Amino acid sequence: MEALSMVGSGGVYSWPAALLVAAIVVSASVRWWGIKRQPTTTESKARLPRGSLGWPVVGETLAFISAAYSAQPESFVDKRRLLYGKVFKSHLWGSKAVVSSDAEVSRAVLQADASAFVPWYPSSLMQLMGESSILVLGGGLQRRVHGLAGAFFKSPQLKARLTVDMQRRVADAMDAWQCHGVVRVQDEAKSIVFEILVKALIGLEPGQEMHYLKQQFREFIAGLISLPIKLPGTQLYRSIQAKKRMAKLIQKIVQEKREKRMGGNNNATCKAPRDMIDVLMSNGSEELTDELISDNMIDFMIPAEDSVPVLITLAVKYLSECPLALEQLEEENMELKKRKSAVGGTLEWTDYMSLAFTQHVITETLRIGNIINGIMRKAVKDVEVKGQLLIPQGWCVFLYFRSVHLDGHIYDDPYAFNPWRWKERDMMAASSGFTPFGGGQRLCPGVDLARLEASIFLHHLVTTFRWEAEDDTVVTFPTVRLKRGMPIRVSQNIETSGTATFRSTESASV
């Protein structure tokens, strides 16, 4: 699952640079000097890219963090790209690294199997995820879990159920919006998407247990970016305890399902899976233990914090700043709504996915928003990429998607929000230069659902409300989010003429 950036996925949680550097020093000091004592014959090969390892222990991490907090977070990579080329060596997060802003190199690494590269994450995240997480699993077990998840998330049956649930949940939320005055899109989207995703994963309906799970999830997610110190009172310790409580609840649900199956209930055994737990239990593999199932259900919940809600929120922001795009989006969605109303039909998932311009808006939001800045892999052996580049064993390779998505050689006027660029663009031909959710064997299996959920939200928003967007800015580190949660003031949209329904108080850059 590629829905995690190289520093994890912490949503609204952010650590000052000093704490991050302290974490790096604690986890990297011994490893740095151990590497320095090893023979460096591999490093002397000509195919190793040029670059700088920076300072001892911290390497160039301080410079990366400084750029990440700035208005141009890609400046760290772009400056070195001018000096050394699109691929260069560095030292980040306690590891020697090859940084790639080259679309073809990144694609080659993503397509490589576990015999060449394995996932790499910071120490705190590895401790929190555990060895059974799909984020770190390898080999046949990873392929099995990923394949089962991908098939389930892409199934028409799930999309149909999710569409009904999402429409109902969005409608209920928006009914209450006019009483709120100011609505924070990011918070609303997180609440909606979490409940929808949890139901799809473990079959849990809104109620007391859902509320409890959401509370524990907030504590859990806070530890994804934290000091790698697992002592009582630390954030990592609290997050691990929260995960244990979540796992206990999920394992109770798993056990209840197993008891129904063992009780001779043929309907429970033979009917189509209703959630992801059913899918994994039906596989029959002894490797898919209750612990593995519960751990991975928690991992699959992470996109409900920092992927789909941020995609929705950024789309609202960019539309608020682009009246022509908003107008065309509203016209398209109003036309669909009128057409369905005329025949007394209800909107189905295929209707939402048929909205061409809406899909262009989502695609452009993914490109310019860069919800996932990049990912990291670790070379398990000396790896040659494209016959020219050497990545030594033990080094990490950091695939920096943001610089690719904002590359003027690939996209005209790359910093402009321009959904129309995708009208004539061949998505297959552009695939190496467009990797918002990673790629290869670890491509996020929920990509289709992310698009569907965003489409449903935007449809109901533009056909129900006018809105005034308040000032807000995009924060890109440690994860992408809106600083104030994207506050908007909404009013009922009575007009159906297709006139743009926004008024923004700010025209901000990305």
Curated annotation (Swiss-Prot):
Q: Which UniProt keywords apply?
A: Heme, Iron, Membrane, Metal-binding, Monooxygenase, Oxidoreductase, Transmembrane, Transmembrane helix
Per the record, the pathway is:
Plant hormone biosynthesis; brassinosteroid biosynthesis
Query: Where are the bilayer-spanning segments?
Result: 6-26
Summarize where heme binds, as residue positions. Answer: 444
Q: Which GO terms describe its biological process?
A: brassinosteroid biosynthetic process; brassinosteroid homeostasis
| Reported function | Involved in reduction steps of the biosynthesis of plant campesterol-derivative steroids, ending to castasterone (CS) but missing brassinolide (BL). Catalyzes the conversion of (22S,24R)-22-hydroxy-5alpha-ergostan-3-one (22-hydroxy-campesta-3-one, 22-OH-3-one) to 3-dehydro-6-deoxoteasterone (6-deoxo3DT, 6-deoxo-3-DHT), 3-epi-6-deoxocathasterone (3-epi-6-deoxoCT) to 6-deoxotyphasterol (6-deoxoTY) and of 6-deoxocathasterone (6-deoxoCT) to 6-deoxoteasterone (6-deoxoTE).
Name of the protein in its database record: Cytochrome P450 90D2
What is the originating organism of this protein? Brachypodium distachyon
